[in-house]
Curated annotation (Swiss-Prot):
Gene Ontology annotations for the cellular component aspect, listed alphabetically: membrane
Residue stretches in coiled coil: none
Gene Ontology biological process terms from the UniProt entry: exocytosis
Localization in the cell: Membrane
Glycosylation sites: 138, 274, 279, 316, 409, 496, 572, 603, 621, 742, 909, 930, 1051, 1085, 1193, 1250, 1297, 1519, 1546, 1554, 1580, 1596, 1867
Gene3D superfamilies from the UniProt entry: Hormone Receptor, Insulin-like Growth Factor Receptor 1, Chain A, domain 2
Disulfide bonds: 1188-1200, 1194-1212, 1214-1223
Organism: Tetrahymena thermophila (strain SB210)
Protein's recorded name: Cysteine repeat modular protein 2
Swiss-Prot/TrEMBL FU repeat ranges: 53-98, 104-151, 161-208, 210-263, 267-315, 317-362, 373-422, 427-492, 496-546, 554-602, 606-639, 640-686, 690-739, 760-814, 818-865
Amino acid sequence: MKFKKELINILALIFVLKKNIFAQSICPTGYQMTQGSCTAIQCPNGQYYDSNLGLCANCDQACSACNYYPTYCTQCQNGFYLYQNQCLTQCPQAQTYVSCSGSSCICQACDSSCTQCFGNKNTQCLACSVGFYYNQINSSCLKQCEDGYTQQIVNIGASQQLLCIPCDNNCRTCSQTNAQQCLTCKDNMYLNTATNQCVSTCPQLQYKINGICKICPTGCQTCYNTNPSNPSTVESCLSCVSGYFLDIENQLCVKNCVSGYVVDAATQRCLPCNATCKNCSDQTNQGCLQCQNGYSLTSGSPSSCQNNCPNGNYQNSSLCLSCNTACSECFGADNQQCTACKTGYYLYKTQCLVICPVGFYTFARQYADPLKQPICDYCPNEMEQCEQDKSNFDLIKPILCKRGYYLYNGTCVKTCPDQTYYQDEATRSCLPCVFPCQTCLSASVCLTCATYTPNGQVQGQTYIFAQITYNGPQGTVFQQNCVPACPKGFYQNSKNNSCQVCNQQCQTCQGPAQTDCITCQIYDSNNMLFKYNNQCYYTCPSSQNNPMYGDKTTQACLPCSQECSSCFNGNNKSCYSCMNGYFLEYLKPECKSFCASDGTYMNSSTNQCSLCGFGCSSCTNGTFNSCISCLNGYYLQQNYNVCYPCPQQCASCTDMNTCQSCNQGYFLYSQTNSCVQQCPLIGFYVDTTQQACIPCDASCLECYGGANNQCISCPKGSYLKTDGTCQQCSQCSSNNECLGPNITDCLNQPICKPGQYLYDGQCLTCFPYCSTCSGTTYDSCISCQTTTDYTLLFDVCKKKVSQTDTQCDIGFYYDSVNKQCYSCHQNCIQCFGKSSSQCTKCSSGYLLHLDITTCSSTCLDGYYQQDPSIPQCSPCLYNCINGCSSGYQFLLGLCFTQCPFGTTAQKENCSFNSKPSIQFAQNLGNSVNNNSQTISLQLLVYSKNLFSIKWRLFTGNTDISNGPIQSYIQNRFDYIVFPPKSLQSNTQYTIQASILDLANNCQNENDCMVQQTFQTMNAITKGNFNIEINSAYLQLTLIISGWLFNSVPDNISFDLYVKLTGNDYFFFDKGQNYQDGRFTYLIPNLSYDLQDNKAQFFLVIYNDFDVQIQQLLIALNLNLQQTTISIDEFLDSVYSKITTLQQIQSLSYQFYSQMQNLMSSQTTSQTIFNRHLFYQVYSSLKGVQIPCDSNINCSGNGKCLWSQDNYNEILCICNINYAGRYCEFQSYQLDIARQHLIALTDLISNIPLNKSSDLFFTIEVLLELTYFYSIFDEFTLNTLINVYFQVFNQLQRVQSNISDEKILFKISKLTSQLINLINEDQTLSYNDQQSLLMKTMNDFDSQINLYLQNFAKSFDDLKSQEQVQTSFQTDISNINLNLIYQNDLLDAFMSNNGASDGQQQTPIVFYGDQISYTFDITQFSPKSSLSTAVIKWNSNPFLSQSQYQAPFISCITELVIYSQQTEIQISTVSQIVEIAIPKILPTPILSVIRPFYQPYTCIYFDSVSQVYKQDGVQYLRENSTHVICGSEQISGNYGVIVNQEYIDPNLSLTVIWNATQQIYANDQQFINFINQLINSNNNNGTNENPQVSQSSFNPNLSLLYALLIYIIFITIFIVISIIRDRKDQETYIKESDSYWLVHPIYSLIFGPYSSFFPRLQRSINYAQLIINLFLYNAIFVLVYSLPSEQELQQNVGKRQIISIQISSTSVACSIVTYYLTICMVNLFKMKWYIKQKWLDFKQDKITTEIVEQVTKSLKIFHLMNYGLVFMLQAGMGIPIIILILSFNSQQNQFFFTSVFASFVIDNILDIIILISFCFIKIFSQSEKSKIILLFTLRGFYYPVYEFLDIEDKIKEYQQKGEVLPAEEANNQSDDEDIFEINDHMNTPKRIFKKNEEKIDKAQEEIQLNEFVNNLKTNQ
């Protein structure tokens, strides 16, 4: 029966393939035939078009849209991220960042400046592109480093890395070689060019210019530059050093004054001589040594110069001529030759000027000579501009100081006195720091902050110091200010009162840690972080018991809906997985209790609505034979529960022969229940509406409609009338026909006897059994002979049959409705209906088309006759319509350009070979890199009776395979796998494969054998390593030399791992290209972590394994470039060369792309042929009874059978009371095991797979379950297979966190048990993804099994560890290596970690300031090994029977250690050695089931005492086949025993299985754990105590009462709102929609916000309503749920009433209070401000007094308002106090006291918050805001803001006591918003007039004074 079901399923799928391929043969791939034309196939959402099957297949569950194959996603479901056409749960952190649009999120590539990035921005980099500098502080990549950083190029490996190194704190830019050497400085700092340091004040003999301290000229003590914009100009001296004198004219220091100048010893300046002197000894006229022209020197001492001419004249030769008009005395006619000036002029040198030049001042004091006029005297050295004090002529006051000096208190100083002032370069003065800075460097850079005392407070508050850096439009901006509160992203550090930056995940915070967040970052509406426990997460933390999601509204982590076990961000009902009892809808993130009838079923193993089988619309499970109903176009085969496709022309059908509706272009023919392209012409017409063939009226022969007047032709004996009806020939005899109604229209014919009929004027004999007829055929009878047993039915004389007789004669079929036999069509001799398309056997000369049950004389288009001797037509599948075109060979309905493997070309056909065929799929050649490569060789086999394949390996003539490696194959391929290091380098090998065929002359190995020779390459010879380190930047240099490559590609690279163990730091640099030389690595962010007098350890690991992998990838890429490669060769080249999951991931995209290219570029007939060949081999298998052998002996409890239904597999038929795949179990043991398997299956089915920990645990459980796979029933197997596929898919998503070797080992172990079970499901052969998965698993299984087979041959020498200690000073100068080899293959599979810390040497003891560093370079291959040789003793020779009662679980093993292929003896080791001891039998891993118990004890044999001991050896871990023990000493033989607490001490090895089951049976803790998981959804069961249920119900009821009362109050206030609204409209008095403020909720949402009701106050009021509504009920629940005594239980009713009363009263008072507050506001605005005249508006102008009155009024109003609120709410406590006194018991008083206390605290907190807000609001208002508030109270709202922009001018005129001019006010008017006073309403009103009419200019010129007067008038 099972075989029959599978065969039916196979035929159905083949039919679908034929149908689709037939359409594809006409239309291109991706198109289908529709109404005679090819149209593109459109698949529904969540599906893609599978070009191989020609169907729409489902996308992966994570994809919302895909192409090509299920996992090639183009759009992802919510909660997944699209990356390289894959949907991931999170983006790869090092390559992408998250970018969301709507609900679709994509992993976008990093910015072009980054090669790796992280976070939510594309500019948060980990590594930079070429030409960009990396800033480690802010993780950015820049073309040029920012200010404060210097650009450095560091050699790392063979490449160079560009870094931005931080400069010294005061530097803006610094040197590339030394970050402490500044190039430019920050603001208010100056570069000392001598030291390259930035200083705030330049040293002596230097001056400041453009941020630089420049050296003064020679002789200058202080100097400055007169033109800072041109630093190359000459400096000017201010003072001179000793021995030099200041030349004021040239601003230089000279040793001697020039002619006309004299030294002033007091000031060390060169002063000009008297104007009459050319040269002098002092400045007076008495010290002249030489006179000007026209003057003569007087005799005597002192001497002076006298004018030779009268005053106002000068001497010219012998004449006295008049001086210039400005000169009163002169020595020439020019204005430049004056010696004294007239009134109004000042003598400057020898020139008379009206104003003295810059640097001089008017010296007003008169000289002793009254005729002398004032002169222009020099300003003091530090002054650039100065003036003489009018009251004190001796005092010279500076106006502007020279550069480098600053004006302070009337003097020029070089530095300002203290930091409360700052030096302003613009004004060259000392300005006070701007509040709130207490000390500062500039107006915008504070150093410390001032304190301030808000009004009403006693103690002052200090402003917060904030240093903030942000990116502005002009670049990076640095602010150092004092702020009252820290901005977003910063928090206040109370220790130093400064703003410190928050954690980058926090938007606001209260500290620097991740757990100090107040709010979280928001990048955009779809990209934000969520808060949970004061920490921000990209994805909320969830557990199985507490699933959470990120709510985008509150930005918090909230619980998922109760039906979700995990959900997506944004909606608690958008589920990712479901709780037990709920199922995740297909392609919808919703959990439902039932699945919809949309082709899905409830999968309890995954809690999902999984897809039904092929064609099902509803089903019981996902298998093909579990359908309940079918999709359109399919029908249900009831006997097999399978949905089969309807015939191609049918849109719907009930079976293959009964169509219900037809596809476009076909019509339903009811006579045969089939769809035809053309209706019969006789008796039917086409109804296009119904798309069916409708019978004509009975009177018509042919017609075009169903009426009797729509005839086209008539039957014999009638004629066609003009009205379309048929009329009988009434005028003619019964045997005649007529042409019309007259007798003359009759056609006279002879009268025939009975049994004859008239034909062409002659009487001919009827068909036998006919009495009368119309022809000679069987279906032309009119009546039957009465003497025979026949009856007339549909013009045929049929033999009468009984109701129970269904057998008809040949040529007839049985009609079950009419219980009669009817004749077949004339083309058929056997049929099931009347039509020619209902034949099962054809008449002679006709060919049967089996799939469409049609007989025709020749094969129809699309069919061919495969065998000329068989009258049957088969459908063409590919490349043909009817036979093959020229150049093609025909085979099995396919056309080939070349006959496939296993066949031979014979003319135009391909025929199968009679003998088996065998060949290698590829030639290894001489490119095998044996040292690193896993070599896989594929064998192609065609054999109908294939039994096995044997492999041998030779070197020369030596067979080194150690016996043939036998493989039982399952299909036409086989593989041989050579693990790494199994072959020698530079060696020639011969691989030989032979097959055994039981029926075709392949009885021994040499009959059918192929072989090929290949050459291995030379090995890579490793060179020397050396390490150097630079202490400045923690820079490591790796020196590699002496490597040989020998025909290996040069582009070898390696990975570098650097580990700082003292700081737990790990640095990873991957993919460095190899070259001999130096590789430099800069370890980031560690230079400040090194400490003196403390050991620092580094671990540098060289990954030799990656070198080998890259060689494989190079070879693979070369293969991919060969476009002629076949699919099989391509698959083999991929799967034979990958060894880790990372390589699978990296090659996946390339693999699928190449696969698509191959599939589209070459014919797919090969693939179709392979499937046909597979089924041909399958159907030809014969069962053979064979004897059991050593490999399969059925445990001695059964017989061996070579089964035809299991692909040549040898199976066991067990004896009675035995069961299992190999009859290894007894029946009662089987029953016990099955009970636990049910629980375990449920366990793994309910484990979520969204976390790595859950995934690993599931793998462990699955691995254990596979040991018992032979006892699984069908349902359990299906569950395990589904879970297995889930696990495999999840592995691809989390594989970056998986240790590759361990997972590969587990996958292989799991696959080796499940592979045969999966193959039994034939549907998997037609699913490409599952076929691909199975092939991958086959390869894994083959690879690992052969690893283990060749394990003993792959041991390498144990390399002794060399360790050298090097100590040195802090400036590290040298380092050494420690070479550690990797463990063996088995240890890599079994160990928890790779290179453990235990392999590093212990810290070194040292003294002083020496620091020791140790570097280890660990290579991953070749691997050292400790091998254990298994000694199979019949009995334990070392163990007395009385020593250990517990049985041995393992073999007795002997530990043997080799070095240089020589056995060595080692007694002690420096660290624990791990020893893998094989088990006697594979057993489950008990540590998985009971993780907190140790199941085994490791022991060793002490040869001295001759007993086994446990000291010095310990149990570490186990798997199904080995136990790992750790030993501190190497000694003899080892074993493992089972602990007594696990099993019965008397248990023997023969019943080890029974012992294992007993463990399960006795493990009550495990059973309880299973039950808890199974019943996790049933924890809300019935409680035995009904009082608990009642008490939990009552508080909920009280809450409903409170809500009901609250709704009643809302209704009342809505009614009031409507009444108030109408009243306002009737009275024409409506002030700014004040009725909005009646109802609090309506007002909160829609009401205007004013100074009385800002948003914060409304939010507090609304929160108060919620608190009052639920607070008291919460207290009731809390108190009532305490352990209650009898009195508490008796007063439940009273407490309910009280609780409802409290809640209702609280809500009512809150709403009434709010309403009264609104009324007070309206009353206050309309009456108290106007009628009571609290403000005086009678003044002519707005003054500060008005503002003060507004402030005072607001204070009084708010105090009265909140005082009333407090009294109203405090009054609520009176009834509560009365109720307290009415109860006497202590419990009741405690209850009400708690309620009252909570009530009081609630109201006090409300009042404190509101009053505090009132004061803050008032006192924080600016003067402008207070003035605006004044107008707001008068009814003028927002336009006042624009009108009052003249605040500064008002303030200016108020200070002057003036009124603002009208034109100033007019300039501030608004063209669109005009204010006017409406006289008849007595209320100011705002008129909006926008673009409606041209506003009168007079209205635009309203003056401020008129506006104030209007306000006064309206009072």
